[in-house]
A protein has these predicted regions:
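Gly/Ser-rich catalytic/binding loops embedded in alpha/beta enzyme cores
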Residues: 2-194, 304, 309, 398, ...
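Short, well-ordered beta-strand elements within core beta-sheets of diverse protein domains
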Residues: 25-32, 112-117, 229-236, 376-381, ...
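Short Gly/Pro-enriched turn/cap motifs at secondary-structure boundaries
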Residues: 82, 116-118, 166-170, 198, ...
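Short glycine/serine-rich loop segments
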Residues: 121-252, 449-462, 467-470
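Short, electropositive alpha-helical surface patch
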Residues: 468-481
Length: 506
């Protein structure tokens, strides 16, 4: 057993250096035996001890002694010539919506008297992270059932922003984004139904990617109808993002809609020339989406970076339309039908249990009511509603397919507001416009979700209050590598992540 008696919250200088390394640098150092897995684990646990109490990003952390013993076992494997993969010896905390064998999956809800038993097996993408050599140290905090883009729940409490601890971290991958930004994890997994791999990275000045649907197979109870929630990576560098995506990605016959395309070696294919490309900037969709003052102005400063990369920016303020898709007018109703149908159905068992229903936050009740009794004055969702929504979504795809015949990329802000007061459940208004639901303020992310195309968050800087913002860039379906290459070129031009560290890091 490793001696932990000398462990202390304050990290030494070598530990400070270890947590600052990019994940690929860390991987190389471990492989070359320049640093031991025990040293790495100790450095990250020190960082967590020092910073996590201030942000509440990592939850259900395993005991230090147990984790150091697991790290020692990884060192012994290396000594015997066995290296499991590029994440060998990495501390890794999994988003608390995904199963990890031996850990409860609380989803921000299951607590006494509704305890979640330890999972019996890993989720499919988590299997792959384990096979790559990672050590699971705990979970990253989420919003209840992943609903809403503010990470707060009644099990572990609220996760706050890496750059301002009075502000929201975003959600539902808020814990993951904050942990990566504050160097408490080398990289993190997340998931995205409605912006959760875009908004939290945007608000914490890191990279996040929602891959093409099917790129990362999900081992859900339903593997056919659920085509909106996807898993993906969060990282501080494009190379790290690519490496984690290629670890998580790839076909699996347990997930029949997963993409039969080898993710190959994304991390070694990141250099690309974007000269001659063009991007359609949708902005606020021609004034349709309310935006907090300063959001558009900050995002539009990124036009200069696109230009430096040889990418022409074209203002294209309206959504394209098609036979059954009326653009802006259809966007929110279309999203709501799918959201109520899928989330309300997933929560139906809780809906039927009066005691559990009484413990739910308003976000979940809204989705359940939207399906079964109606919400916002709308009637309950019917099978015909879902069919008609699928027709509209098909038409939307055809409209964007034509748009992508004219443009290489499409871009929008990653959020309509800057990170808000962490004590609020959600923004009630944006620039004087009342929000009709807990998630209407996130509507800017609906396009990427409904299309199922790959989307990446790229940092674009900070407002006068020091709050980060990002833009989401959408590529044609299955062109995930293009976005990773763009992220690499972007970081080389801007250096936002590397040059603008959270003040908590010192």
């Amino acid at each position: 057993m490793v001696d932990t008696t000398a462990a202390a919250p304050a990290a030494d200088h070598r530990s400070d250096r270890i947590v600052e390394w990019d994940a690929v640098e860390l991987s190389d150092a471990i492989a070359q035996r320049a640093v031991s897995c025990v040293e790495v684990m100790g450095a990250y646990l020190d960082q967590i001890d020092r910073l996590n109490p201030q942000v509440n990003a990592i939850v259900n952390l395993r005991p230090r002694a147990d984790l150091l013993d697991q790290a020692l076992a990884k060192d012994q494997e290396l000594a015997a010539g066995e290296r499991r993969g590029w994440m060998h010896g990495f501390p890794h905390a999994v988003k608390d919506l995904a199963n990890v064998a031996g850990f409860p999956t609380t989803q921000g809800f299951f607590r006494p008297p509704f305890n979640a038993p330890p999972a019996s097996r890993d989720a499919l993408a988590i299997e792959r992270i384990r096979a790559a050599g990672a050590i699971f140290i705990g979970k990253t905090n989420v919003s209840e059932f992943g609903l809403g883009s503010h990470t707060y729940n009644n099990v572990f409490g609220t996760t706050v922003n890496a750059y301002d601890q009075t502000r929201s971290a975003g959600g539902s991958s808020g814990g993951a984004a904050v942990a990566v930004a504050l160097r408490m994890l080398p990289v993190a997994d997340g998931s995205d139904f409605f912006g959760s791999l875009r908004n939290p990275p945007g608000w914490n000045n890191v990279l996040g990617m929602r891959p093409s649907f099917g790129r990362v197979p999900g081992l859900n109870t339903d593997v056919f109808l659920q085509q909106f929630g996807v898993e993906g990576p969060i990282a501080r560098s494009a190379t790290d993002l690519a490496m984690l995506l290629q670890t998580m990605a790839g076909y699996d016959d347990r997930a029949p809609l997963s993409i039969e395309q080898d993710p190959g070696s994304y991390g070694q294919q990141l250099e690309a020339d974007f000269a001659g490309g063009n991007v359609a900037w949708l902005g606020d969709l021609g004034g349709y989406l309310p935006m907090e003052p300063g959001v558009l102005e900050l995002c539009e400063r990124s036009f200069e970076t696109f230009t430096e990369l040889g990418i022409e920016v074209t203002d294209h303020p309206r959504l394209p339309t098609a036979t059954s898709f009326a653009g802006n007018a259809d966007l929110w109703p279309l999203f709501l039908i799918y959201r109520h149908w899928l989330m309300g159905s997933q929560l139906a068992t809780i809906h039927r249990n009066p005691t559990m229903r009484a413990a739910l936050k308003p976000e979940a009740i809204y989705e359940i009511d939207g399906l079964f009794t109606g919400a916002d004055g709308n009637p309950p969702i019917t099978a015909l509603d879902v069919y008609n929504a699928s027709v509209k979504r098909t038409s939307m795809h055809q409209a964007f397919r034509k748009l992508f015949s004219r443009f290489s990329l499409v871009a929008l802000p990653s959020a309509q507001v800057f990170a808000f007061d962490a004590h609020l459940p959600w923004p009630a208004t944006i620039d004087g416009v009342a929000m009709s639901s807990y998630h209407r303020w996130m509507e800017v992310t609906a396009i990427g979700t409904l299309l199922g195309y790959p989307v990446i968050n790229l940092p674009v800087g900070f407002n006068d209050a020091g709050l980060p913002m990002g833009i989401q860039v959408i590529a044609p379906n299955h062109q995930d590598l293009t976005l990773l290459q763009l992220a690499r070129a972007w970081e080389q031009r801007t250096g936002w992540v590397q040059r603008h560290r959270p003040a908590l890091l010192g």
